[in-house]
């Protein structure tokens, strides 16, 4: 697999759904806004078939709006590990997903209905090991509430 580009709304949510449906070991999601029901269902189904699922959601917008309460409550109802993004930042606007520690999605799109049907957004899918590892390391540091320093050899823009 080489890097690929998903262009929304043309490509729809299908590539993201397919990745979650095909996950065998793990799914890590970090999302600013998550309310798209087909993706919620896919994440729940992955968990139910034994895939380790971890979801990190931005807790509140700058204006005080809480977009992710419904998603968090639903996912936790199914026993999925959900946490808020790192409190070191006022908000986390990152949108990413790592599947089976093998490939990562780096996205401009939130997982909301309009991002898959109305807005021009993008996702880059990378299987490049050092890029995937950087995303995993940042995710796990945020999850554990530890500092993340990608170092001078980082290949991604942090």
Put a short name on every predicted segment:
Residues 1-24, 30-158:
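HKD-type phospholipase D/PLD-like phosphodiesterase module
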């Amino acid at each position: 697999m080489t890097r690929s580009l998903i262009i929304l709304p043309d490509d729809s949510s299908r590539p993201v759904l397919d990745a979650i449906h095909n996950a065998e070991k793990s799914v890590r999601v970090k999302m600013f806004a998550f309310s798209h029901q087909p993706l919620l269902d896919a994440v729940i189904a992955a968990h139910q078939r034994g895939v380790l699922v971890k979801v990190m959601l931005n807790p509140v917008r700058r204006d005080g709006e809480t977009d992710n309460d419904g998603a968090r409550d639903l996912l936790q109802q199914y026993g999925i590990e959900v946490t808020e993004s790192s409190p070191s930042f006022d908000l986390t606007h990152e949108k990413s997903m790592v599947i089976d520690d093998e490939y990562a999605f780096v996205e401009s799109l939130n997982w909301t209905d309009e991002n898959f049907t109305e807005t021009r957004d993008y996702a880059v899918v990378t299987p490049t090991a050092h890029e995937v590892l950087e995303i995993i390391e940042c995710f796990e540091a945020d999850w554990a509430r530890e500092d993340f320093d990608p170092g001078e050899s980082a290949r991604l823009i942090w």
